[in-house]
Amino acid sequence: MLGRAATVEAAEAALPTLGIEGAQELGLLRRDDARVTPAVDLRPYSFVDALGPAEWWIVSDLGELALGHALPEDHVLGVGGASMTLSGLMLQRPARTALDLGTGCGIQALHARRHAERVVATDISPRALELAALNADLNGVDGIEFRLGSMFEPVAGERFDHIVSNPPFVITPRVDGVPAYEYRDGGMVGDALVAAFIAGCGEHLEPGGVAQLLGNWEYHGYTDALDRVRGWVDGSATPLDAWVIERDTEDAAGYAETWIRDGGTRPGTAAFDQLLGAWLDDFEERGVRQVGFGYLLLRRAEGVPTLRRFERIHGSLGANEAGLGVALDAALAAHDLQAALDDDALSALRLAVAGDVTEERHLWPGSDAPTAILLRQGGGFGRTVSADTGLAALTGASDGELSVAAIVGALAQLLEVDEAALRDDLLPAVRGMLVDGLLTVPPQG
């Protein structure tokens, strides 16, 4: 982790089984007379998913602090925040085949193999593939095939049940003097790499197959970047369901500074100022005022696409011990269920309020009538639904025993309103709460 040298004796004591020679053969250490130095970064990594807790050891290249200088362009990144975000988002359903596009150190491929029978992992970097294969061997994970190449070229003509990608989406000026780090720079202008992924993924998905990735998108002038992403999805030759969530935005200067520091160039130096100028010139020339970051879930539609959701969730999420992927999977199933039901069929369901939902009421002192009712979700995306008296009452009465129709009928009498009008008012909210996981469908007896 620290990149510090150690004596041969200390290294032998720390590696009683592998030994220094074994570590050298694996490319983990370098020996210079009486001292050894690490050739790579080796860290423990632990996580919890739907299959339970697990621990791995992950090898990557030494970071800036250990090297003492800026990163080389062929640097292979270890497990960072983006890696853990994507692995947490990963659907955890059984799959026959999975693809990890842009595998880097191989962390997503290792996660995918826990649920897929066979995984293909690709990267443009031979060094990355070498370390990814080492990580698979180091952790006793088989069933992963490693291939060299860009984007979907290494899997031409193949289709997968699940595609995951933490692609090199960082927006980088295409000018001399700006490092093109393989782990983050896809070699395209602006956010074209994310657009290219969306355009190409459909033909590599089995019907009903899902692709998940992280990405950036640019705000040009005063246009909405999510509208641009929607246009990419609509332009896919293969019909796609889409769920895109923007998690954050950063202005042009802040974005540039973030990624210049990420490469190990320090603020206050001439090199930093030169790179910052290149980034800002590029953004100004192309009219970019800010950059969004978020999650994309794309599914090859089995017919006409029914899911088109583009939203912003910039705050904190709910508690998800086994990862947000569990909630995403449940949301997809709930979406498909309600999309196939007309209002009469939906009304016949007996729903139950999820166990992590709480109700919050705001009242003026001395008043019995709430001025606001909020239904808060503890897990999933941690959503808050603003409810009126009718929706709050329906939610509270949803115990899995009474149908939606029965609850609406009783509420109409209690509130002295027209039952049909109340149903028309409540059912769209019921559909949304079902998809978002505030309401669930228990087994229907």
Predicted regions and their residues:
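Short "lid" loop at the C-terminus of a central beta-strand within the Rossmann-like core
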Residues: E153, V170, G187, N216-G221, ...
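SAM-dependent Rossmann-like transferase core, predominantly class I methyltransferases
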Residues: D33-A98, T103-H111
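Flexible, glycine-/basic-rich loop-and-beta segments that form/coincide
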Residues: A252-A331
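Conserved Class I SAM-dependent methyltransferase catalytic core
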Residues: I124-S125, G190-I245
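Acidic, low-complexity/disordered tracts enriched in E/D and polar residues
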Residues: M1, D41-R43, A66, G303-G396, ...
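Mobile active-site "lid"/loop adjacent to the S-adenosyl-L-methionine
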Residues: P126-R127, S165-A196
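Conserved SAM/SAH cofactor-binding pocket of Class I
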Residues: G80-S165, I171
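Long, charge-rich, low-complexity alpha-helical segments
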Residues: M1-D41, G88, L99, G104, ...
